[in-house]
């Protein structure tokens, strides 16, 4: 592929050849990734009320009237960006530009790679990103009244939230050569989490540039999911009934004595992970600014096998919240039953 007057620009492109791929531009060469974006925002709410009549049978037999109401609301947010790298695959790859050559979310893979760049050789790895937020809240209350029995009032509250985010390099950008090695010449080389690497011996790798700069990329992921719940109730008024002998009795129920709370311990699922995508150059015959040097003297990472360390993927946050709610509901029921007993 030759451009005699302008640039060569490949985006989200896969080029495969059995023998050789050649890019020759009079100006610049840009190989970059495409992006897949996902965005979702949602809200939900519910409210309800009910009034009814019932009959109780037992020590406090009678007709009662009850009223209950509930309200809940929630929201969810998701935003993600995924990079789809441009890739070149062949036995030999030749890249030549009079101006700059930039690999921004791109990989060139071949047994031998030759690059002759009149300007800057920029190799930049791209991070995929993911941000999630889930929130849910609910409250409820019930009041029951009847003649001859104490009034009952109860309520509950629950709140859950989860947040997760990650940014990580999935596929490192770079020139990846085999036993034929890399043979790179440029005015300036800049690596941002990028790689110039090969599986060849030092003698088969050559890098010549007037200047070199490099930096690593930090990857991270973290999430936190929390659920809290509280329920309680009280009774008050005059309570009439019959004891085991059939005798009538009357009790005055004091709300201070009959009030109960059933809080559950907050549940939390929390984790984080981090890693580094290293700017990397495999050991070779390296000359920077007219002086021979080594990767050790440059202080740059040289092991391509450990150059791009992945972080843990985010878990299903909604599944975590659902599990926490099941545990919270069960715990609240046990606590309430224990206190009643």
Where are each of the predicted segments found?
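Binding/recognition "hotspot" determinant
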Residues: 2-341
């Amino acid at each position: 592929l030759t451009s005699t007057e302008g640039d060569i620009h490949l985006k989200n492109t896969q080029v495969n050849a059995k023998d050789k791929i050649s890019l020759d531009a009079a100006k610049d060469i840009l190989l970059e990734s495409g992006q897949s974006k996902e965005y979702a925002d949602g809200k939900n709410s519910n409210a309800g009320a009910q009034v009814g009549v019932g009959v109780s049978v037992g020590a406090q037999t009678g007709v009662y009237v009850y009223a209950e109401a509930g309200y809940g609301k929630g929201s969810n947010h998701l935003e993600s960006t995924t990079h789809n790298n441009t890739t070149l695959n062949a036995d030999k790859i030749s890249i030549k530009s009079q101006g700059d050559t930039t690999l921004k979310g791109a990989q060139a893979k071949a047994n031998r790679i030759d690059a002759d760049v009149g300007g800057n050789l920029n190799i930049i790895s791209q991070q995929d990103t993911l941000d999630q937020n889930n929130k849910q809240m609910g409250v409820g209350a019930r009041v029951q009244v009847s003649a001859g029995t104490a009034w009952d009032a109860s309520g509950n509250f629950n709140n859950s939230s989860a947040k997760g985010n990650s940014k990580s390099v999935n596929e490192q950008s770079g020139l990846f050569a085999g036993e034929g090695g890399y043979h790179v010449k440029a005015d300036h080389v800049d690596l941002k989490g990028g790689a110039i690497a090969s599986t060849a011996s030092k003698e088969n790798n050559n890098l010549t540039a007037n200047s070199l700069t490099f930096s690593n990329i930090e990857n991270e992921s973290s999430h936190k999911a929390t659920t809290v719940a509280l329920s309680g109730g009280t009774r008050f008024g005059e309570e009439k009934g019959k004891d085991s002998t059939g005798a009538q009795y009357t009790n005055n129920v004091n709300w201070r004595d009959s009030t109960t709370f059933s809080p559950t311990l907050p549940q939390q699922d929390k984790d984080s992970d981090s890693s580094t995508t290293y700017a990397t150059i495999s050991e070779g015959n390296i000359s920077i600014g007219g002086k021979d040097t080594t990767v050790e003297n440059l202080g740059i990472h040289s092991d391509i096998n450990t150059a791009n360390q992945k972080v843990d993927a985010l878990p299903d946050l909604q599944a975590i919240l659902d599990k926490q709610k099941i545990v919270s509901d069960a715990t609240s029921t046990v606590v309430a039953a224990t206190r009643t007993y």
